[in-house]
Amino acid sequence: MKIKFVDLFAGIGGIRIGFERAAKRFELETECVLSSEIDKKACETYALNFKEEPQGDIHEITSFPEFDFLLAGFPCQPFSYAGKQQGFGDTRGTLFFEVERVLRDNRPKAFLLENVRGLVTHDKGRTLKTIISKLEELGYGVSYLLLNSSTFGVPQNRVRIYILGILGSKPKLTLTSNVGAADSHKYKNEQISLFDESYATVKDILEDSPSEKYRCSDEFIGQLSKVVGNNFELLHGYRLIDYRGGNSIHSWELGIKGDCTKEEIEFLNQLIANRRKKIYGTHQDGKALTLEQIRTFYNHDQLEVIIKSLLQKGYLREEENKFNPVCGNMSFEVFKFLDPDSISITLTSSDAHKLGVVQNNVPRRITPRECARLQGFPDDFILHSNDNFAYKQLGNSVTVKVVEKVIEDLFQNNVNELFGQMKLANVV
């Protein structure tokens, strides 16, 4: 039997690869009869790997060949925690209704939709309920799973929702929602894996001999050495950001705007740790504090000299006789050094190029190939030749391994509903 499928919002083809792998396990042939992707650079990568050019804007595709299965990772931005939660009010938010149109007009047997975890809680859950209701109105039974890539042998903390539907039947699944460890520290302790494979870590995806172009600059390495000396492996798991919180390195510790004394560093660290306390107000990012308020937690006899110096260097600003650190995300080559013995934070299109690792005591950025491995792409997958586009595309993509396992589970437990009396190979 040949399964004909449509690949909408195809990106670089991550969902397709997972789907085709799952079908192959059951010795099922597949044929993509239509793919659609609006991003031209993503289309270039898709064409390199699948030898076909996706069609463009879904709004302009009015007719489809006959097909059995719809794949659609409709765009994340409207529902993502990483961006503004605009939802259906945003133009991109209405793209779900294009999915609805395709299902209504073509009535395929089944579908897989993928989206960000924010879809579950968006608008207090009403957005997801709306989506499921619309799908059920079309005659589809619907199930969904909230899954973390890190529990599928892929060392990335990436929680996504997978919505599955079968025409006339609610999908039966053995997989259950599992969001995995909340962060890399808990993952390191819990070592979660849903399958027989041992749990994966960042060191498993590192290239042996990455190009020198990914090595951090001498200037940046020099700044880092002010904090860790020559033992750069101490950077494992650290982020570079001017906010409070564990495992953070700040601009004043690196001397970005000028070297700071130990007292100045201690003062700024105390200031960001204390300024959000309720006794000083409820402003989310911390209130500017008076000299008197500062003395309640940092009563140094040279406090005024320290403050004057930090004002001159630009680490501190004065607002009506109150003081606040000049905070923000720093435009460094790397904003987070991954712990090789744990998992990566979630790859995103905007900052995949700024994730780093220390390998053989050398700080560097992770490579596009390593990003691809964090998404479960095979090493023979051809990446875009421009690194900037490759990082963006991989940050926007899906984790291939999760799609593969979800589709395997769907096929395994819904043979009659999907394939009638046909006997599938390798069904347990």
Curated annotation (Swiss-Prot):
Top-level taxon of origin: Bacteria
Enzyme nomenclature, EC number: 2.1.1.37
A Gene Ontology biological process term: DNA restriction-modification system
Cross-referenced Gene3D superfamilies: DNA Methylase, subunit A, domain 2 (3.90.120.10), Vaccinia Virus protein VP39 (3.40.50.150)
Ranges of residues in domain SAM-dependent MTase C5-type: 3-417
Alphabetical list of NCBIfam families matching this protein: dcm (TIGR00675)
Protein family according to the UniProt entry: Belongs to the class I-like SAM-binding methyltransferase superfamily. C5-methyltransferase family.
Assembly and binders: Monomer.
Protein name in the entry: Type II methyltransferase M.BanI
